[in-house]
Amino acid sequence: MPMRYLNAMAALLMMFFTLLILSFTGILEFPSASTSMEHSIDPEPKLSDSTSDPFSDVLVAYKKWDFEVGCARFRENHKDAILGNVSSGSLQEFGCGKLKMKHVKVLVKGWTWIPDNLENLYSCRCGMTCLWTKSSVLADSPDALLFETTTPPLQRRVGDPLRVYMELEAGRKRSGREDIFISYHAKDDVQTTYAGSLFHNNRNYHISPHKNNDVLVYWSSSRCLPHRDRLAKSLLDLIPHHSFGKCLNNVGGLDSALSMYPECVAEHNAEAKWYDHLHCAMSHYKFVLAIENTAVESYVTEKLFYALDSGSVPIYFGASNVQDFVPPHSVIDGSKFGSMQELAAYVKRLGDDPVAYSEYHAWRRCGLMGNYGKTRAVSLDTLPCRLCEEISRRGGKNAGV
């Protein structure tokens, strides 16, 4: 065998034994399944297995989270949420290319629960303007008529205003007479969510920096549906809570919130209604129980969004695709737990873990909205412009029948 081959073999053997020695001494470490798991970033925060650390000051809790986790890691954990993928589709985004009208006039017909302060002349995207009004004087020649509690006309001829029908309740059903249908589902002509702020402009938005330690959960309901009360009771019996409203009330009456939290009195009205101080009262609790009247896909109402606005963590029962509508890691989906006992145990442990609890608020502090950005973008706040755009795409009164 030539000498050069012997030299090569000797060199290889020396390298092999050197690497073997280094690996045994720990100087050189090869990747392994256990090593990569130890150094990977957990997608969800782990609840501490150590002694609980009850807290009431959320600002102190946030600082602990900043030190132990931080926004960079949170963004890495939830980088897919930045794309805002919606499994159930829509949360609409349309371009300007198919618009046929620069100005659209919408006349709202009959009684509607949409507040009057929505009436306005709007400057919309794509150089459009939109008049939304209940006045037939201001909209003397409307391009569309909007109906909610009344049924649109049976027939429409070319040259007549388009017929728009809105139904935002869980059992959403077309009238069969509309040209454009507004509701909460991705399949609807104009999708609209409950995530806006339009309906509570005059509320007290004071957010308490301190959370109750002895009472974890806030719940308020005055429409006492049997199935919802049973569901609420099955969880609340296991967790310290305050129940406001008529259903399962345990705070001594309907108007107890202001005596418990006097800072929640609205400045403009010392005798405010319960909903005027709703967010402020909620903000004193680490968790808010939010149960929809009906569990239907995409039917996500103000019950959930109020809790998010108040700086609390919602415990949610309702739409199976709720994650399509909310910020990343912001909601506890009660349906994902095997039992109420399991859910209650999780909530109690979370309430005593300042770092894991703060993770549920990281989306707001780190500016990671995910799908929630789209949810807010298609709320009732933006409905006038979005409806006018749809009317423009169809050509308004010149649309075919």
Swiss-Prot record:
Swiss-Prot/TrEMBL keywords: Cell wall biogenesis/degradation, Glycoprotein, Glycosyltransferase, Golgi apparatus, Membrane, Signal-anchor, Transferase, Transmembrane, Transmembrane helix
Transmembrane segments: 5-27
Subcellular location(s) per record: Golgi apparatus, Golgi stack membrane
Pfam families attached to this UniProt entry: Glyco_transf_10
UniProt topological domain (Cytoplasmic) ranges: 1-4
GO molecular function: fucosyltransferase activity
Ranges facing Lumenal side: 28-401
An annotated GO cellular component: Golgi cisterna membrane
Pathway(s) per entry: Protein modification; protein glycosylation
Membrane topology, from the record: Single-pass type II membrane protein
EC number from the UniProt entry: 2.4.1.-
Tissues with expression: Present in root, stem, flower buds and green siliques.
A biological process term (GO) from this entry: cell wall organization
Gene3D superfamilies attached to this UniProt entry: Glycosyl transferase family 10, C-terminal domain
Stated role: May be involved in cell wall synthesis. Catalyzes alpha-1,4 glycosidic linkages and generates Lewis-a epitopes.
Family membership: Belongs to the glycosyltransferase 10 family.
Protein name, UniProt field: Alpha-(1,4)-fucosyltransferase
